[in-house]
UniProtKB/Swiss-Prot annotation:
The gene coding this protein: rplX
A biological process term (GO) from this entry: translation
Family: Belongs to the universal ribosomal protein uL24 family.
Record's keyword annotation contains DNA-binding: no
NCBIfam families xrefs: rplX_bact
Lineage, top ranks: Bacteria, Pseudomonadati, Campylobacterota, Epsilonproteobacteria, Campylobacterales
Cellular component GO terms, alphabetical: ribonucleoprotein complex; ribosome
Protein name as catalogued: Large ribosomal subunit protein uL24
A GO term, aspect molecular function: structural constituent of ribosome
Function as written in the Swiss-Prot or TrEMBL entry: One of two assembly initiator proteins, it binds directly to the 5'-end of the 23S rRNA, where it nucleates assembly of the 50S subunit. One of the proteins that surrounds the polypeptide exit tunnel on the outside of the subunit.
Subunit structure: Part of the 50S ribosomal subunit.
Assigned keywords, A-Z: Ribonucleoprotein, Ribosomal protein, RNA-binding, rRNA-binding
One Pfam family, short name: KOW
Length: 78
């Protein structure tokens, strides 16, 4: 696959233009270039189960941002 340039990068402020979180704005936490997806702070939050470990002896649930396709976000000019 060829190197693809995206119009957005980590730290940019973007607005969600499609999907369940349409209209929300947030900062990009990371860009997944190979999948053409971005993770936006506070958008598309899912509850994930955590197995017990030394850090979290009881396990539990956490809220985690899930990736959004790059075509569903638009850069917001500040």
């Amino acid at each position: 696959m060829a190197n693809v340039k995206f119009q957005v990068k980590k730290g940019d402020l973007v607005k969600i233009i499609a999907g369940d979180d349409k209209g929300k704005t947030g900062k990009i936490l990371s860009v997944l270039a190979k999948k053409s997806q971005v993770i936006v702070e506070g958008c598309k939050v899912a509850k994930k189960a955590i197995k017990p470990s030394e850090k979290i002896p009881n396990g539990g649930h956490i809220n985690k941002e899930m990736p959004i396709h790059i075509s569903n976000v638009a850069k917001v000019e500040e």
